[in-house]
């Protein structure tokens, strides 16, 4: 089973690692066979599984249910679970809700925010809960951002994001996840923290790992598709098409053919 120590080793060795969202045991098993390194039980299940307009209605109970299902189906990947909207507003909430999803099978929890999360990160880490902090475009704050848009478009905004990353890493964050930021910034942050694995989604191909929502990479997105998405399913055929799509994603992340230039945001900072 892959651990946080393995992710740190991968970064030190320059080996890129793969991450996909997953919500059920059957997909989890296919990801195990494809040797996907990391699985995120994301609150994206609100949209991808529950058919909602955002992640905001998702509950801790939802996250624990799907975490347990994924863990039963996959004994290979590191399992990371989102704490959903407003479930870590207080330190006590963060501890109790982290306990719930960790007992369901998570090895790490993910929370969204910046420097203001430092105390939460510190308390969780001291209590044995590895924390991934999600920065950049954070879907739980979609109404604050006014929609799903590229973040850190200016040098000033990029420096603020770097300051947020620094604060949470110093507080003990084990992993960073950057969403929807310029490729140059993704590279800067990955290089700035040599002992902290950085996962990207729409953050260029210089981050240490890459994550996609599984429905997106299988072509099950109806309507507008984000720039950073590649449909790996359309390249496959036959009864093993889904498994082959997972294998193709894993290989493309490792050889850095994904994300390609067309999947990234090129902004001069």
UniProtKB/Swiss-Prot annotation:
EC id: 2.1.2.11
Enzyme class: transferase
Residues annotated as signal peptide: none
Listed cofactors: Mg(2+)
Annotated HAMAP family: PanB
Similarity section: Belongs to the PanB family.
Record's protein name: 3-methyl-2-oxobutanoate hydroxymethyltransferase
Record gene name: panB
């Amino acid at each position: 089973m892959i651990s946080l120590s393995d992710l740190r080793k991968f970064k030190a060795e320059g080996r890129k690692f793969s991450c996909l969202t997953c919500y059920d045991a059957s997909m989890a098993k296919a990801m195990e066979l494809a040797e996907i390194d990391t699985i995120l039980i994301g609150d994206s299940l609100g949209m991808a599984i529950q058919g909602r307009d955002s992640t905001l209605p998702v509950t801790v109970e939802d996250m624990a249910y799907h975490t347990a299902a994924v863990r039963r189906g996959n004994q290979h990947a590191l399992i990371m679970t989102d704490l959903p909207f407003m479930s870590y507003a207080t330190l006590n909430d963060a501890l109790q809700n982290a306990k719930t999803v960790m007992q369901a099978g998570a090895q790490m929890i993910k929370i969204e925010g910046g420097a203001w999360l430092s105390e939460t990160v510190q308390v969780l880490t001291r209590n044995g809960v590895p924390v991934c902090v999600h920065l950049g475009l954070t879907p739980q704050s979609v109404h604050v951002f006014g929609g799903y848009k590229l973040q850190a478009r200016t040098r000033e905004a990029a420096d603020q994001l770097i300051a947020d990353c620094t604060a949470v890493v110093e507080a003990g964050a084990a992993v960073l996840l950057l969403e929807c930021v310029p490729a140059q910034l993704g590279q800067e942050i990955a290089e700035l923290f040599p002992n902290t694995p950085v996962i990207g989604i729409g953050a260029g191909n210089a981050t240490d790992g890459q994550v996609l929502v599984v429905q997106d990479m299988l072509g099950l997105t109806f309507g507008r598709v984000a720039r950073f998405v590649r449909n790996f399913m359309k390249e496959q055929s036959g009864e093993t098409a889904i498994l082959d799509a997972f294998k193709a994603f894993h290989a493309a992340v490792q050889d850095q053919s994904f994300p390609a230039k067309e999947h990234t945001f090129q902004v001069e900072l």
